[in-house]
């Protein structure tokens, strides 16, 4: 997983609340056996509407999504995070995330930055008044800069550390590779073994 320190990209105002994982990517798009290629399913029902924000330049090139409260509710669908990332989003900003979505995002490398709702409203206003406005998100300092405005965000320390280090679940395991190999060498021969790679 790529480490996340700062990201600068076009802000996209998604003025919707209670966006669940089925709205992010409908189940019909989940039939792949790979972890990539889900961008076509992102907000598929809404993208049929020509006035939907992702159909409008410059928002169609955005990478910082500013969404309403309760983003990512519904089922535990990792594909929702993958679809956002495959489309090009690196950050989702909201005043409230579903716990499972927040966890899936952090494990995949997508920053779920939680701010208060007044700051979401302020960011929406700035983005809509200045289409193409670039937003910088700094994970180390835990702030968002849009024009002359700086907004703090919250994220738990463990998820922030994983993102800063670029550690997904496999990366975390590989940090202990020598200890795992040592354990395997010391196991009794009659117990099952993992095969060397």
From Swiss-Prot:
The keyword Oxidoreductase does not apply. It comes from the Bacteria. Pfam families: Aconitase_C (PF00694). Its EC number is 4.2.1.33. It is an enzyme of class 4 (lyase). The keyword Amino-acid biosynthesis applies. GO terms for biological process: L-leucine biosynthetic process. It catalyses: (2R,3S)-3-isopropylmalate = (2S)-2-isopropylmalate. Keywords: Amino-acid biosynthesis, Branched-chain amino acid biosynthesis, Leucine biosynthesis, Lyase. GO terms for cellular component: 3-isopropylmalate dehydratase complex. Pathway: Amino-acid biosynthesis; L-leucine biosynthesis; L-leucine from 3-methyl-2-oxobutanoate: step 2/4. GO terms for molecular function: 3-isopropylmalate dehydratase activity. Belongs to the LeuD family. LeuD type 1 subfamily. Catalyzes the isomerization between 2-isopropylmalate and 3-isopropylmalate, via the formation of 2-isopropylmaleate. PANTHER family: 3-ISOPROPYLMALATE DEHYDRATASE SMALL SUBUNIT (PTHR43345:SF5), 3-ISOPROPYLMALATE DEHYDRATASE SMALL SUBUNIT 2-RELATED-RELATED (PTHR43345). Heterodimer of LeuC and LeuD. This is 3-isopropylmalate dehydratase small subunit.
């Amino acid at each position: 997983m790529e480490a996340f320190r700062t990201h600068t990209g076009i802000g996209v105002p998604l003025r919707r609340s209670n966006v669940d994982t089925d709205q992010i990517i409908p189940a019909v798009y989940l039939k792949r056996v790979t972890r990539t290629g889900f961008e076509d399913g992102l907000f598929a029902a809404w993208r049929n509407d020509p006035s939907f924000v992702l159909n409008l330049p410059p928002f169609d090139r955005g990478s910082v999504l500013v969404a309403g409260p309760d983003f990512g509710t519904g089922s535990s669908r990792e594909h929702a995070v993958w679809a956002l990332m495959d489309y090009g989003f690196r950050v989702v900003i909201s005043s409230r995330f579903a716990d499972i979505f927040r966890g899936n995002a952090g494990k995949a490398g997508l920053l779920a930055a939680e701010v208060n709702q007044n700051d979401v409203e302020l960011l929406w206003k700035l983005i809509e008044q200045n289409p193409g406005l670039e937003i910088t998100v700094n994970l180390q300092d835990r702030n968002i800069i849009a024009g002359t405005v700086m907004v703090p965000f919250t994220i738990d320390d463990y998820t922030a550390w994983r993102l800063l280090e670029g550690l997904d679940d496999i990366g975390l395991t590989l940090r202990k590779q020598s200890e795992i190999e040592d354990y395997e060498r010391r196991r009794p021969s009659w117990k099952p073994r993992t095969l060397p790679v």
